[in-house]
């Protein structure tokens, strides 16, 4: 009977540092990429989330997720003097949840359909949670939110459009497609470098359930 895929503390630390450094540097690079506008639609590179997604699908998902969130916080926010508190905490939590769930959903990294669905699913979860938090922040900040004419509709429309834009543009081009290409290519080749066995359906972590959530 094969054992579940487990990692030692040193291996988890290596995955954490690898995810933090690679994704942190990638977020610095995205700050330099200009956005362009077509009519009322603005296209911009939100993030290169494929980096932690690939690591989460091949290694320990929690280590990769926490590393990515920490890397973005340190490299993109604190080092650039953009740390604002609540917004960064929100991004830290949503990125961790999205990447972790995506990594747990993949049992066989060779299954391209599951890899693609998990990658875009992780992006959707992260973006949806961020959208909900942004809407709630406006509701709590504005007294009598429903009483202001047109405010609820404009907030929902703006946040909803931003959600779709980020998922369809950055989510597909810079998250799902690179992940779909890299995970099968790296599977079985990068794990031995950290002294780990490749993930299989028999050794993968158990599916997400109530016990895991608790």
Language-model segment annotations:
Residues 63-71, 86-90, 113-117:
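Hydrophobic alpha-helical membrane segments of integral membrane proteins
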Residues 2-27, 90-138, 180, 184, ...:
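Short helix-perturbing small/polar motifs within transmembrane alpha-helices
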Residues 35-37, 41-42, 109-214:
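Membrane-embedded alpha-helical hairpins and interfacial helices in multi-pass inner-membrane proteins
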Residues 46, 54, 65, 78-80, ...:
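Short alpha-helical interface elements
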Residues 1-64:
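Hydrophobic transmembrane alpha-helices
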Residues 21-28, 70, 154-159:
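Short hydrophobic/aromatic-rich motifs at helix boundaries and adjacent loops
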Residues 27-42, 71-104:
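Interfacial aromatic-anchored transmembrane helix boundaries in multi-pass membrane proteins
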